[in-house]
């Protein structure tokens, strides 16, 4: 039976409308809104400047006075929105608890909250999201990682990301905010190493990086500890 022309038009209109609604709904739930590039970069640069000021002048700066001349200002990769991606947190069924070795030869107790799943430069990747124990509540996720720049362009032990918990399970994974642990500046700090599953087979050229090659100086105990922790697979620096 052939529908009248007006009915056919109504069906087409309804179908198109429904498709638009579904598409918009999926976009809203599957990814954060596109960033305001100008405002985002401006805020990022301001935060970097504030960190430099604190590291240079703050009474609680983790950078020893005799190292500030070559460690500061902190060196960064240029802001790059390619390295700001949405990630979905898949909650771990058992949320295992395990011990993580640290830069001082100690251990920290961590719990795997879940796995962050994301795409970076067209490649599917994952990172374990952790919480240090004991903790009264999980308000932030700790994401330590190493990548293909570790040991050459960035600190051999890796870098960190901190993420505020979300109700949706969708996270703004911004590697432009990846930072070096405090033990990079002073070996007296105790810093957990990234777990094996958080060693990315990709170069993350975003966030904090090492000073120029001829200025690289590491705390004396760092290379030996890293070599022991990583089974000898780290380059010498």
What role is predicted for each listed range?
Residues 2-18:
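Bacterial N-terminal signal peptides that target proteins for export
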Residues 26-29:
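C-terminal motif of bacterial Sec signal peptides marking the signal peptidase cleavage site
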Residues 93-157:
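Mid-length scaffold segments of soluble, non-membrane domains
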Residues 31-33:
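Bacterial signal peptide processing site
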Residues 151-153, 170, 178-237:
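Extended, aromatic/histidine-rich regions of cofactor-dependent oxidoreductases associated
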Residues 43, 48-115:
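N-terminal secretory signal peptides
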Residues 144-179:
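Acidic, glycine-rich flexible loop segments
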Residues 90, 121, 146-148, 176-178, ...:
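Solvent-exposed coil/turn segments that connect beta secondary-structure elements
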């Amino acid at each position: 039976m052939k529908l009248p022309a007006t009915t056919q038009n109504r069906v087409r209109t309804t179908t198109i409308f429904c498709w638009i609604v579904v598409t918009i709904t999926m976009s809203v739930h599957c990814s954060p809104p596109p960033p305001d590039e100008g405002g985002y970069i401006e805020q990022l640069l301001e935060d970097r400047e504030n960190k430099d000021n604190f590291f240079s002048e703050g009474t609680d700066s983790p950078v020893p006075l005799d190292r500030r001349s070559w460690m500061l200002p902190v060196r960064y990769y240029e802001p790059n929105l390619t390295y700001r991606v949405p990630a979905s947190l898949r909650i771990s069924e058992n949320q295992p608890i395990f011990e993580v070795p640290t830069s001082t030869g100690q251990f920290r107790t961590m719990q795997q909250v879940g796995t962050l799943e994301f795409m970076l430069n067209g490649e599917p990747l994952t990172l374990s999201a952790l919480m240090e124990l004991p903790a009264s509540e999980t308000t932030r996720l700790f994401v330590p990682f190493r990548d293909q720049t570790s040991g050459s362009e960035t600190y051999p032990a890796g870098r960190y990301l901190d993420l505020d918990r979300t109700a949706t399970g969708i996270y703004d994974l911004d590697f432009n905010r990846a930072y070096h642990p405090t033990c990079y500046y002073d070996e007296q700090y105790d810093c957990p190493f990234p777990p094996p599953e958080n060693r990315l087979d990709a170069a993350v050229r975003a966030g904090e990086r090492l000073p120029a090659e001829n200025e690289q100086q590491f705390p004396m105990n760092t290379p030996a500890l890293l070599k022991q922790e990583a089974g000898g697979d780290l380059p010498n620096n």
